[in-house]
Design a protein with these regions (language model features):
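Interhelical loop/hinge segments that connect adjacent transmembrane helices in multipass membrane
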Residues: 1-9, 188, 200-242
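Signature of the first transmembrane helix
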Residues: 3-64, 230-253
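Membrane-interface helix-loop junctions in multi-pass transport and translocation proteins
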Residues: 163-197, 327-332
Length: 340
């Protein structure tokens, strides 16, 4: 069982760690363009997209659990329906984001105190990258579905490919074609759709036989769709609470001065690192527990929960000890400012 957990958790951890690299690459590129306003624009735009997409993370989490349950039951029709529902809901949400992009941007600038120059470049970045919403949310559905099918390697391959495409495209647009923030935004946009197309290609190649189980008539009706929205609404509100807490943490620190804000930002980096690793085991839990529930394997389910609980305790204690004794050293790698 531990082997199964690690086989699912480790690729998921790698995938999670690559997520912030997309934004980091953008910042690194504009950081060489000679204006701090470019960096500020990417920071503001990146933060805004992170909050938006984090809120809709239920498309991945809910999909993985429900796919795993259908897979455990060997109900291949419901397996396919779950993917189609997730991608369909993602496309509908994307349409809403497109329609509301101007109010969203104006609301963000009310909350974010930035210079007019930063707002101008951030608006350009946002108005380009928002067209990638279908790719991002659609990929959430595919990633959750792959994990539910006990396959966390495909999301890892997709995440790595996205980073490579983003780096190459952004470098070409900025340093070859002479673009600025818009070049970085276009590179990110291309990488997002490259990830979605890769997910679809992998699905066709390795799961194409499931096309025979597509049932359009039962896609949006019955108990299954009620459960789909019931589970995802719970996850949605849970995520809203997390976003509210982290936003409060950042905004409160900002009101207490630059030093406190900097300290809180560094501490959040340590917290984020821990979260990415723990989330890998959470994904493994979603896939395995869902499969055991679907197969009505109570013995396997109890053993899975017990082992995941032990992994959680072990990792929590390990990180607590690590941060307690080496916390200052980790912070020293992130900054040399003695006031922080």
């Amino acid at each position: 069982m531990n082997r199964k957990i690690l086989q699912l958790a480790i690729p998921s951890i790698v995938s999670n760690i690559t997520v912030p690299l997309l934004g980091l690459v953008d910042v690194a590129i504009v950081g060489h363009l000679g204006s701090a306003s470019y960096i500020g624009a990417i920071a503001v735009g990146g933060m805004l997209f992170n909050m938006i997409y984090w809120i809709f993370g239920f498309l991945r989490m809910g999909t993985s659990g429900m796919t795993a349950q259908a897979y455990g039951k060997r109900d291949l029709t419901e397996v396919v329906r779950t993917l189609l529902r997730a991608v369909g809901v993602g496309l509908l949400i994307s349409l809403g984001l497109w329609i509301l992009q101007s109010p969203i941007l104006r609301g963000a600038f009310v909350l974010i105190d930035a210079t007019e120059e930063v707002k101008r470049w951030a608006s350009l970045y946002f108005n380009i990258c928002i067209w990638g919403a279908p790719a991002v949310l659609g990929l959430y559905g595919f990633a959750g579905w792959f994990i539910g099918m006990q396959n966390s390697r495909f999301p890892m391959f997709i995440a790595i490919t996205q980073n490579i495409v983003n780096i190459v495209a952004s470098l070409c647009f900025v340093f070859v074609l002479g673009m600025k923030v818009e070049g970085v935004a276009l590179g990110t946009l291309i990488a997002q759709y490259a990830g979605l197309f890769m997910a679809f290609a992998l699905w066709l190649k390795y799961y194409g036989r499931l096309k025979a189980y597509i049932d359009w008539d039962g896609l949006w009706g019955g108990e299954a769709i009620r459960r789909f929205f019931s589970v995802n609404s719970d996850i949605f509100f849970r995520t809203l609470c997390l976003v509210a807490v982290t936003t409060f943490f950042t905004s409160t620190g900002a009101r207490q001065g630059d030093v406190i804000l900097a300290v809180n930002t560094l501490l959040m980096q340590l917290f984020t690192l821990f979260s990415y690793i723990m989330d890998g085991f959470a994904y493994a839990g979603e896939a395995l527990a869902g499969r055991f529930i679907g197969a009505k394997n109570d013995v396997g389910l109890r053993r899975c929960i017990r082992l995941l609980f032990l992994w959680g305790i072990g990792l929590s204690l390990s990180f607590t000890i690590l941060y307690a004794f080496l916390g200052r050293d980790f912070l020293g790698l992130l900054t040399n400012d003695t006031s922080v």
